[in-house]
């Protein structure tokens, strides 16, 4: 007797889903109506997410390479011995590396990605007029039209995705701003605006920055807020020695919070933020020069909009025997395994590195053609139940006369700034 696919036992259907890679979930859900209904149930999603997060103790990440997104997993053996890190036979047994492409659309190329609570804010390589928010697990998307499009391939705006309601993790908003400061008040231009998912509208924010955030800093999301590396606006040097956050609930920036003072004594020029299980911030400190053989990673022991405290997670000082790898863009922390992972900043841009205690360094060739114009990046990722709210038809909030006037003023200021030679 043949059993129809729709009549398979639930436990068997669940096992099929658990074995399917993220990129194929949508196709499997659409196999039949009952499977699609099951996959959308809250109880099943919770079970699926729990199993995916713990299966084989894998570290799940989203990586961007070649203007495409990948679901990537790295399994680090519990028995990794840092003292044996440079013995090839031992190294080959300690790491398992997997990656699978996930497509928003096979024709759409991604130039940047920002992660918040399982949602991905994607910036398009060939379209500078809009961005898209995507939940890869649910297959939901929300396209957002920008009020002012940047120059193609030269986006100088900074973006952040967050939410107002900290209890339900709802009421999502998109922050967008540009801030140029060239040493004198007349040589500065800033414009801060926020998009509300519920009203489908943009609002200009009243912000006068006393800080400086560099346009190449993409920031990281933590508990609905976004954090960036920053410095005092009036500081004479370019050393980044603080972080700053944007609170989406109050729609305002918090105070400058200090990076760990001990590590700043090493005069690191590059500071990159990441997060640990969406609970803590992590800060990676590196030097510009390739011949430096040290770097530090610190993680927060307490973090909110007003207060921060730090603890050293990992320090590497190899001395002259080996150059410390330079991690490109985002990085991933496995707190239990005491390792950091990311793409190495090299010419070919196809080396993934894992760094641990006592000088442990493992380099993995991803064995793929790599577009050198695309800087690879990686971030932690856990599939999410968060729903992306669609705008109700005919419910778009009308732009007020005040908002129209503020927008026009910002555009006039922008044109004047360009005439002064401001790079935009």
Curated annotation (Swiss-Prot):
Domain of life, per lineage: Eukaryota
GO CC annotations on file: cytosol
Alphabetized Pfam families for the sequence: F-box, FBA_1
SUPFAM superfamilies: F-box domain, Galactose oxidase, central domain
Domain F-box, first and last residues per copy: 2-47
Name used for this protein in its record: F-box protein At2g38590
Protein's organism: Arabidopsis thaliana
């Amino acid at each position: 007797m043949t059993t129809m696919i729709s009549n398979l036992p639930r436990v068997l259907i669940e096992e099929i889903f658990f074995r399917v890679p993220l990129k194929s979930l949508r196709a499997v859900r659409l196999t039949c109506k009952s499977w699609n209904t099951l996959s959308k149930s809250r109880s099943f999603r919770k079970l699926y997410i729990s199993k995916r997060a713990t299966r084989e103790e894998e570290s799940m990440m989203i990586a961007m390479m070649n203007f495409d997104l990948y679901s990537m997993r790295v399994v680090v053996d519990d028995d990794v011995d840092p003292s044996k890190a440079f013995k090839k036979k031992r190294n080959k047994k300690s790491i398992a590396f997997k990656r699978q492409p996930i497509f928003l659309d096979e024709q759409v190329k991604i130039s940047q990605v920002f992660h918040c609570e399982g949602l991905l804010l994607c910036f398009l390589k060939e379209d500078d007029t809009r961005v898209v928010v995507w939940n890869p697990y649910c297959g939901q998307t929300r396209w957002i039209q920008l009020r002012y499009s940047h120059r193609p391939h030269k986006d100088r705006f900074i973006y952040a995705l967050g939410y107002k309601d900290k209890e339900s993790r709802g009421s999502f908003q998109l922050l967008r701003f540009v801030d140029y400061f060239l040493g004198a008040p007349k040589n500065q231009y800033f414009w801060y605006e926020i998009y509300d998912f519920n009203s489908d509208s943009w609002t200009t924010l009243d912000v006068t920055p006393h800080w400086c955030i560099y346009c190449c800093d993409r920031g990281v999301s933590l508990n609905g807020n976004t954090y960036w590396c920053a410095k005092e606006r009036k500081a004479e040097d370019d050393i980044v020695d603080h972080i700053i956050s944007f609170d989406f609930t109050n729609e305002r920036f918090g105070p400058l919070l200090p990076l760990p003072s001990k590590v700043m004594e090493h005069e690191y020029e590059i500071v990159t933020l990441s997060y640990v299980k969406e609970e803590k911030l992590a800060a990676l400190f590196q030097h510009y020069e390739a011949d430096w053989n040290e770097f530090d990673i610190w993680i927060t022991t307490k973090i909110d909009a007003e207060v921060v405290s730090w603890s050293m997670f990992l320090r590497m000082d190899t001395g002259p025997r080996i150059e410390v790898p330079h991690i490109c863009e985002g990085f991933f922390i496995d707190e239990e395994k005491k390792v950091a992972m990311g793409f190495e900043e090299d010419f070919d841009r196809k080396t993934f590195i894992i760094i641990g205690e006592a000088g442990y360094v493992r380099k993995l060739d991803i064995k793929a053609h790599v577009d050198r114009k695309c800087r690879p990046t990686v971030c932690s990722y856990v599939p999410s139940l968060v729903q992306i709210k669609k705008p109700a038809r005919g419910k778009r909030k009308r732009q007020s006369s005040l908002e129209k006037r503020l927008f026009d003023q910002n555009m006039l200021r922008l044109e004047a700034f360009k005439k002064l030679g401001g790079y935009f």
